[in-house]
């Protein structure tokens, strides 16, 4: 499996956004079930939080959610990256960004608590209804844990 993961990861360096998007997404799906298989590439995934293509940024969030499902403890120092994505100019990225806070709020609420005020503010001010709802969901997940 390691060879296949390496081949998938090689597409992360592609100049073609669709290939980067798919590679990041695949690494997240693999990492959900076997973090050790993607661990060598994990920190490198964070560069996609600022990718020029919104779909790649969205895939980065999805990949992070997948990995965080079973390996949440590794995300503590990286929360500022996700906080920045809450302000992304792309609606779809902003709609998904609160979901990593929800996933981690259930598993490691101490990672999310410092961001509850920000999530609350966005839940009251963002122009996008889904963003507001997802921010509230992240707050509720954190409070319930």
Positions of the model-derived regions?
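Alpha-helical adaptor scaffolds
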Residues: 46-73
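Extended alpha-helical scaffolding segments
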Residues: 91, 98, 102-114, 122
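Eukaryotic acidic, Ser/Thr-rich intrinsically disordered low-complexity regions
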Residues: 116, 120-145
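Alpha-helix N-cap/helix-start positions at coil->helix boundaries
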Residues: 2, 17-18, 54-55, 89-92, ...
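Structural signature of alpha-helical solenoid repeat scaffolds
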Residues: 28, 65-66, 102-103, 140
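Alpha-solenoid helical repeat architecture
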Residues: 12-15, 49-52, 86-89, 123-127
């Amino acid at each position: 499996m390691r060879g296949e993961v390496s081949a998938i990861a090689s597409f992360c360096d592609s100049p073609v956004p669709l290939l980067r998007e798919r590679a990041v997404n695949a690494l997240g799906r693999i990492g959900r079930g076997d973090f050790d298989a993607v661990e060598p590439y994990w920190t490198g995934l964070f560069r996609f939080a600022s990718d020029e293509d919104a779909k790649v940024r969205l895939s980065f969030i999805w990949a992070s959610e997948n990995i965080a499902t079973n390996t949440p403890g590794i995300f503590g120092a990286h929360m500022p990256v996700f906080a920045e994505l809450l302000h992304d100019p792309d609606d779809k990225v902003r709609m998904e960004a609160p979901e990593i806070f929800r996933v981690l709020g259930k598993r490691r609420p101490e990672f999310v608590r410092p961001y509850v005020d920000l999530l609350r503010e966005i839940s009251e001010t963002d122009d996008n209804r889904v963003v507001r709802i997802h921010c509230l969901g992240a707050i509720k997940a954190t409070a319930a844990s």
